[in-house]
Amino acid sequence: MLYYLFEYFDKTLDVPGTGVFQYITFRSALAFMLSLLLSTIYGKRVINFLRRQQVGETVRELGLAGQNEKAGTPTMGGLIIIFATLVPVFLFARLHNIYIVLLIVTTLWMGTIGFVDDYIKIFKKDKQGLKGIFKVIGQVGLGIIVGAVLYFNPAVTVRTDTGKTDVFKTAANTTVVLPAPVEEKSTATTIPFVKNNEFDYAEVLSFMGDGYEKWAWLVFIPVVIFIITAVSNGANLTDGIDGLAAGTSAVSVLALGIFTFVSGNIIFSNYLNIMYIPNSGEMTVFISAFVGALIGFLWYNSFPASVFMGDTGSLTIGGIIAVLAIAVRKEILIVLFCGIFLAESASVIIQVTYFKYTKKRFGEGRRIFLMSPLHHHYQKKGYHESKIVTRFWIVAVMLAILSIVTLKLR
């Protein structure tokens, strides 16, 4: 909202200095600082409120060291992250930008699903929370909305080349400048480590013959649904020990922030020879607010945690990361900058699959990991959770750097 106020001051009243709000970098810095302050200063008040309302974590007996000490710790702390993210976004972002609208919808949508899940667990004393089928329906619903908007909305365009112009002389010694390519709808995405690193989902339907491109949504929307569901569930599984989900998510989002900034800037995208996505740079403001909120939340969530984010936070985090990756056409790189989420999810899938297979084959279930998700495996091996979290953060940073390197490494 302040963006529009200062825009009025600048363009209508011609007030000196107010034009600084036109710069994404300036607004991103303000969004980060405000979200950090909100999550640290007001976070304590939210925690005290949750404690007074007896919104405490119910700990399942898993045989893990120190787990009983966590009983009664306030949960639903994801409300802090949501609040500290949205307030700066409403103040400093261009709210008519389609990408900002999508991210706000994603935050509120996934936050609501997570909140209902936590509410049922705490106040209805149902340890299972919201039934899995309803979570999936919510995730699929968001996927359909995001996929449809990105595919059909005319404001979402992509320029798949560098935007360079060719200047040459004709035989008549006339200078000719080729016009810049037209920005158009596209379902292209980025493939890492490949020279001509773009793949169009529409190509999957090339067997349909001429005009197959108009049916690309049949592939694109299911892909969006899968990514949102997978990443949000991966974030949910990662939220098992103090500071793990918030810290690794902050690293992932920082990597996405770099992708978003360069993809939305025609100069940087031209230099790096990457896909230019008009208007996507505005997401940098949202990302800055989101990172500030996550870091501020870590102030209280690091070991020993004073608050847990609950599904209110973890599902929201996963949904936001997924939508950011899809919007900036870096969803394939999720396996790198969200490598921790992938490892946690894979450990659960492998554990359950192997247990069922061995039970059917040998009459008794066997396990590959001492416990899944993966962080519990290391807890069972005797590692202190703070050491596990620190090492997972280090791995997350390495994977994020590797994903950023793909901008030039082909």
Curated annotation (Swiss-Prot):
GO terms of molecular function: metal ion binding; phospho-N-acetylmuramoyl-pentapeptide-transferase activity; UDP-N-acetylmuramoyl-L-alanyl-D-glutamyl-meso-2,6-diaminopimelyl-D-alanyl-D-alanine:undecaprenyl-phosphate transferase activity
Protein name in UniProt: Phospho-N-acetylmuramoyl-pentapeptide-transferase
Protein localization: Cell inner membrane
HAMAP family in the record: MraY
The enzyme's E.C. designation: 2.7.8.13
Role played: Catalyzes the initial step of the lipid cycle reactions in the biosynthesis of the cell wall peptidoglycan: transfers peptidoglycan precursor phospho-MurNAc-pentapeptide from UDP-MurNAc-pentapeptide onto the lipid carrier undecaprenyl phosphate, yielding undecaprenyl-pyrophosphoryl-MurNAc-pentapeptide, known as lipid I.
One Gene Ontology cellular component annotation held by this UniProt entry: plasma membrane
GO BP annotation list: cell division; cell wall organization; peptidoglycan biosynthetic process; regulation of cell shape
Primary location recorded for the protein, binned into one broad class: membrane
Keywords linked to the UniProt accession: Cell cycle, Cell division, Cell inner membrane, Cell membrane, Cell shape, Cell wall biogenesis/degradation, Magnesium, Membrane, Metal-binding, Peptidoglycan synthesis, Transferase, Transmembrane, Transmembrane helix
CDD domains registered for this protein in UniProt: GT_MraY
Cofactors named for this entry: Mg(2+)
Membrane topology: Multi-pass membrane protein
Segments traversing the membrane: 23-43, 73-93, 96-116, 132-152, 215-235, 248-268, 285-305, 307-327, 332-352, 387-407
Taxonomic superkingdom: Bacteria
Known catalytic reactions: UDP-N-acetyl-alpha-D-muramoyl-L-alanyl-gamma-D-glutamyl-meso-2,6-diaminopimeloyl-D-alanyl-D-alanine + di-trans,octa-cis-undecaprenyl phosphate = di-trans,octa-cis-undecaprenyl diphospho-N-acetyl-alpha-D-muramoyl-L-alanyl-D-glutamyl-meso-2,6-diaminopimeloyl-D-alanyl-D-alanine + UMP
Enzyme class: transferase
InterPro entries: Glycosyl_transferase_4, PNAcMuramoyl-5peptid_Trfase, PNAcMuramoyl-5peptid_Trfase_CS
Family: Belongs to the glycosyltransferase 4 family. MraY subfamily.
Pathway as given in its UniProt record: Cell wall biogenesis; peptidoglycan biosynthesis
